[in-house]
């Protein structure tokens, strides 16, 4: 599945719709659904039908085009369009790729604002398609740079899902793993389940098994056990937002893994495109962390797993301190956290 698009613009009718994999159904069903309105896109992002920072960015670009299509008969077209874009941008606050894509689409509108509404719509669609295609190429570059870091016979731990389904295709952290596998590095991947939404168990194992990459599923609390035994000697995860100093927001539990890796002397890498680096954010303290519904923790398969009345706090992300990160793998190469300002300002 590394080579197919998991989210793409589909030409249908006058302008088209967004076509994406419904990730809430995996691993039980691989199904693509059509998103036809900006409200549907907001809901798809919010409810994690589409998830993964790069994929959310493309979804935002598609949502902007859908909003323009909806408003083509309205007066005050551009102001109303910007309001809808801002609404889509509010669906998930932590992943910077969403706001990056909305900003890209607003720039397209500004460049074409003297043209007809139809021309603006077409420009937004074409830019969204361009971003789709660029994402796959970016991920393959990340994969190739990262694969050079992976030792032979490596036991690689990854957290959550930063694969084809978290992007348009190929993946960031899983892109590194895919490229290492192609280079016959004889790897074993350890995917932790990633509570509470189980993206590692549901989605990462689904991707890797489909691609024939040796994979072992472990629970979130097991990483130190396998590190101490020498079975894990390399860690790579994706990212949702990287601050200027290298502090990195990623799925809750990432920081715990990084601390354990540091203790055992295991290199911990982040794999992410330039669009995930937010130079306006100085440190991780300034990153907004999304809090999600407590039922994600309390209920599994429709059944409660805890006592009634217990309190739950459910942050979706944590911030890994830059001092724990060996390097950040981008489409431009691998950088130490302290090198970001010089190379991406």
Predicted regions and their residues:
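Conserved phosphate- and dinucleotide-binding cores of soluble alpha/beta proteins
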Residues: 187, 193-345
């Amino acid at each position: 599945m590394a080579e197919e698009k998991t989210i793409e613009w589909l030409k249908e009718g006058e302008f088209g719709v967004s076509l994406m994999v419904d990730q809430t159904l995996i691993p039980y069903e691989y199904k693509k659904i059509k998103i036809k309105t900006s409200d549907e896109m907001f809901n798809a992002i919010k409810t994690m039908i589409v998830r993964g920072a790069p994929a959310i960015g493309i979804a935002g670009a598609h949502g902007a085009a859908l909003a323009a299509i909806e408003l083509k008969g309205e007066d005050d077209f551009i102001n109303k369009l910007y309001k809808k874009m801002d609404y889509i941008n509010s669906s998930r606050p932590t992943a910077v790729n969403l706001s990056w894509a909305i900003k890209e689409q607003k720039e397209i509108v500004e460049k074409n604002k003297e043209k007809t509404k139809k021309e603006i719509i077409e420009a937004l669609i074409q830019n969204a398609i361009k971003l789709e295609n660029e994402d796959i190429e970016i991920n393959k570059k990340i994969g190739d740079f990262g694969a050079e870091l992976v030792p032979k016979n490596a036991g690689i731990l990854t957290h959550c899902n930063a694969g084809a389904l978290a992007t348009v295709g190929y993946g960031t952290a899983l892109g590194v793993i895919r490229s290492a596998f192609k280079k016959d590095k004889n790897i074993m991947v350890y995917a932790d389940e990633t509570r509470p939404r189980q993206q590692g168990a549901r989605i990462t194992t689904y991707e890797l098994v489909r691609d024939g990459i040796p994979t072992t599923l472990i629970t979130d609390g097991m990483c130190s056990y396998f590190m101490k035994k020498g079975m894990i000697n390399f860690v790579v995860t994706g990212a949702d937002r990287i601050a200027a100093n290298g502090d990195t927001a990623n799925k809750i539990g990432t920081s715990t893994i990084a601390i354990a890796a540091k203790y055992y002397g295991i290199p911990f890498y982040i794999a992410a495109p330039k669009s995930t680096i937010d130079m306006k954010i100085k440190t991780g303290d300034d990153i907004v962390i999304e809090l999600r519904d407590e039922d994600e923790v309390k209920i599994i398969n429709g059944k409660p797993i805890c006592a009634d009345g217990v309190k739950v706090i459910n942050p979706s992300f944590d911030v890994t301190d830059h001092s724990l990160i060996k390097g950040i793998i981008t489409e431009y190469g691998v950088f130490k956290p302290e090198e970001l300002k010089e190379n991406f300002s």
